[in-house]
Amino acid sequence: EQTPGDLNRIYFTTGGSTAVDSALRLCQLANNIKGARNKKQIITREKAYHGSTYLSASVTGKERDKTAMDIKREGIHFLKAPCHFYYPEFDNEDDFCDFLINELEEKIIEIGPENIMAFIAEPILASGGVIVPPKNYNYRCWEVVKRYNIIYIADEVVTAFCRLGYWFASEHVFGIIPDIIIFAKGITSGYCLLYTSPSPRDGDE
């Protein structure tokens, strides 16, 4: 009832990192089934944090969060972080936003949309410094990505469950309907979701 658009199926995982891995694997599965086996490239962003498992660490844009263990580098493309503070050469946020959108579209054209599996983005880059992107940035990215028939993954591990005033920020705050939405943490109010069901006989004895 609360998920954006027609997102009406849930796949449970063990945490946010594995949720990201699962989302990317589902993209691979869908493309392979459709015969689009060349669509393997992933676009992400600098300063983004998507997790610590193999694939989620690979699409994370924070080098200090990447351990000495191997990660996947081939086929992962990083765009600039949507933080105006890092790029003072732009006089205003609107010009900076235009630059970021152009960068995204140029990267898609460079790689070839027929080769791109997904674009993954946090609506607000939390671990990267609580980076709030320029106004309309998320919506404009979504427009570009959908124009080129690329899967849009919204990583709402941090922003979902009313962190920004709504169950999910993608639709109500940023006006986008992602193809896949990832959430964790807030779904259990921060409690670790674990369960054991012992036999009543154990208690009786």
PLM regions with names:
Residues E1, S170, S197:
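Acidic-glycine-rich active-site phosphate/pyrophosphate-binding loop
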Residues Q2-M117:
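PLP-dependent aspartate aminotransferase-fold enzymes
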Residues I10-V20, V158, I182-T188:
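Active-site nucleophile and cofactor-binding loops and adjacent substrate-binding regions
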Residues A23, I120, I153-A154, I177, ...:
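Generic enzyme active-site microenvironment
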Residues E114-G129:
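Short acidic, glycine-rich surface-loop motifs adjacent to enzyme active sites
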Residues I131-G165:
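Catalytic PLP-binding core of fold-type I/II PLP enzymes
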Residues A169-K185:
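Conserved active-site segment immediately N-terminal to the catalytic lysine
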Residues Y195-E205:
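Single conserved hydrophobic/aromatic residue that forms the stacking wall/gate
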